[in-house]
């Protein structure tokens, strides 16, 4: 069976991705202490962010990571189906099937999902960044965004390889159509632009339609009358 990925994770960014994941595994996750009338409670930083409806995607995208992201999205919808959810993206990309699972869940749930690039959104990371709610996709000013075509490996009999090659082409077309729908580009333009790695800074990603805003500083909350 073909294993289809956005290929960036498997060459230039392999060391980067591995370093992130190894660093998370080998370091202590910060804890946040909250005090109330009932005493103190300790939360790991990611659980505390989840209480604020913030999900952090900070690694390569595989089935395990996708399962965690999808579970958090569904949980937050059950908590409040009207309030926005925020996904902060710093990812080199990864598995297409895992990424599409996250994408479908983002579109399925009722709350708007706002996406913010912090550091890098490459490959499937860029795809998910662009998939946030229209008008609610952003990047910090020095982030890097990259799009390209998916890659996949195939083995077995010649007939099996042909079938798998056709499947990869179908997936490529699907991804191009989805990205075109979120950026306002036509499908052929997306195909040409993603033929090879296309790197963009935040302003270029804004011009391309992957994001809607570039934030140098978090906007101040609106004052209530």
UniProtKB/Swiss-Prot annotation:
* Keyword Protease (UniProt): yes
Enzymatic reactions: Hydrolysis of proteins to small peptides in the presence of ATP and magnesium. alpha-casein is the usual test substrate. In the absence of ATP, only oligopeptides shorter than five residues are hydrolyzed (such as succinyl-Leu-Tyr-|-NHMec, and Leu-Tyr-Leu-|-Tyr-Trp, in which cleavage of the -Tyr-|-Leu- and -Tyr-|-Trp bonds also occurs)
Amino-acid biosynthesis among keywords: no
Kindly list the places in or outside the cell where this protein is found, as annotated in its UniProt entry: Cytoplasm
Primary location recorded for the protein, binned into one broad class: cytoplasm
PROSITE patterns, per the entry: CLP_PROTEASE_HIS (PS00382), CLP_PROTEASE_SER (PS00381)
Give one Pfam hit by family name. CLP_protease
Q: Where is the active site?
A: 123, 148
Q: What are the UniProt keywords, alphabetically?
A: Cytoplasm, Hydrolase, Protease, Serine protease
Q: Kindly list the GO CC terms recorded for this protein.
A: cytoplasm; endopeptidase Clp complex
One of the protein's GO biological processes: protein quality control for misfolded or incompletely synthesized proteins
According to its UniProt record, this protein's enzyme class is: hydrolase
Which GO molecular function entries does the Swiss-Prot or TrEMBL record give?
ATP-dependent peptidase activity; ATPase binding; serine-type endopeptidase activity
Stated EC number for the protein is: 3.4.21.92
Quaternary structure? Fourteen ClpP subunits assemble into 2 heptameric rings which stack back to back to give a disk-like structure with a central cavity, resembling the structure of eukaryotic proteasomes.
Sum up the protein's function in the record's words.
Answer: Cleaves peptides in various proteins in a process that requires ATP hydrolysis. Has a chymotrypsin-like activity. Plays a major role in the degradation of misfolded proteins.
Family, as annotated: Belongs to the peptidase S14 family.
The record's section on NCBIfam families has:
clpP, PRK00277.1, PRK12553.1
Q: What is this protein called?
A: ATP-dependent Clp protease proteolytic subunit
